[in-house]
Amino acid sequence: MKNEFTEILENIETALRKSLPEKTNPEWQAGTFRNLSDCVTDEHIQNLIKPCRNLMDLGGKRWRPLLLVLCSELCREAGKNSPLSLEQTYSITPLVEFVHTASLIHDDIEDSAETRRGKPAAHISFGLDTALNAGSWLYFVAPETIDTLKTTVEFKNWLYALYTQELRRLHLGQAMDIYWHRNPNLFPSVNEYTQMVHLKTGTAIPKQTWKLLLCG
């Protein structure tokens, strides 16, 4: 199955690296930070990029952005109208993958986990303060892909509203998880636990987005 999706996954990696490059350039800096003083160097910015880029480079199945692209392709094969071209769909894959990456960085901090994907967790490698700040920053980098979309203002506003709503749901799911960790004598019901998993995991794959891409 991996070989079947090789080209799609390569295109996804290209989109992710464009939004979060290992080395910055003036165009990316302007799009991400707008005007910066000359005293701000790439070394300063790397304190944000490296913890995030390092975790992404350790692997991950990329099934969230893969599903996003596959749904977009299904829409076209079914002859349905979609507000996004395939190229635009690739360009917004950071919306789901960056949220996932940021949540892993924060989750490892909150769980006091020492490893992630077989390597030291971000807060172990880079320090808690740097990892926490970088993870938070990545949540705000993702919607930059909405800013650059060539589409209607109404559709952009819809995407922004969807994105922020899903972030709120993600943090509610994490709050439920932390609550049970801090109260080991409390046992969640099946429905409660299922809801927590849905909020945390399902948030990175907004159902509304699939509906939009499939139904136009």
What are these regions (language model features)?
Residues 116-138, 186-201:
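Divalent-cation-assisted or electrostatically stabilized phosphate/pyrophosphate-binding catalytic cores
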Residues 74-85, 143-162, 177-178, 182-196, ...:
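Inter-helical turn/loop segments and adjacent helix faces that build the functional surface
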Residues 1-99, 105, 109-124, 175-188:
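Conserved N-terminal diphosphate/IPP-binding helix and adjacent helical/loop segment
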Residues 13-16, 20, 52, 138-139, ...:
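Hydrophobic alpha-helical core bundles mediating ligand binding, dimerization, or RNAP-core interactions
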Residues 63-69, 135-144, 203-210:
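Well-ordered alpha-helical segments within folded domains of soluble proteins
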Residues 129, 133, 166, 170-174:
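Mid-bilayer segments of alpha-helical transmembrane spans in multi-pass integral membrane proteins
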Residues 87-113, 164-170, 202, 206, ...:
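Active-site alpha-helical segments that house and flank conserved acidic catalytic motifs
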